Amino acid sequence: MPQIGLPRLVEIIRECAGDPDERDLDGDILDVTYQDLGYDSIALLEISAKLEQDLGVSIPGEELKTPRHTLHLVNTETAGEVA
């Protein structure tokens, strides 16, 4: 499975949150916590489920801290499948 970048992650976040354009996710958000971006634990569970559904990567919602951390977890997991 190919690695994903921030644009695809933002797409997933927007799909799961149900607010496609209300939050500013176009700026420098890599190191901003999901809590500071306005996402609660339910949204993180939905993001986690979407990552598993779309990418086959199982990451518990409570492990999702920031977009950068999420990308690291996803891309490490997908790289491990190829190796």
Swiss-Prot record:
Domain Carrier: 3-83
Location of O-(pantetheine 4'-phosphoryl)serine modifications: 41
Pathway: Antibiotic biosynthesis; tetracenomycin C biosynthesis
InterPro entries recorded: ACP-like_sf (IPR036736), PP-bd_ACP (IPR009081), Ppantetheine_attach_site (IPR006162)
Reactions catalysed, as given in the entry: 10 malonyl-CoA + 8 H(+) = tetracenomycin F2 + 10 CO2 + 10 CoA + 2 H2O
The encoding gene: tcmM
Native species: Streptomyces glaucescens
Protein name as catalogued: Tetracenomycin polyketide synthase acyl carrier protein
Gene Ontology molecular function terms on file: transferase activity
Assigned EC number: 2.3.1.235
Modification after translation (UniProt): 4'-phosphopantetheine is transferred from CoA to a specific serine of apo-ACP.
Subunit structure: The tetracenomycin polyketide synthase (TCM PKS) is composed of a ketosynthase complex (TcmKL), an acyl carrier protein (TcmM), a cyclase (TcmN) and a probable second cyclase (TcmJ).
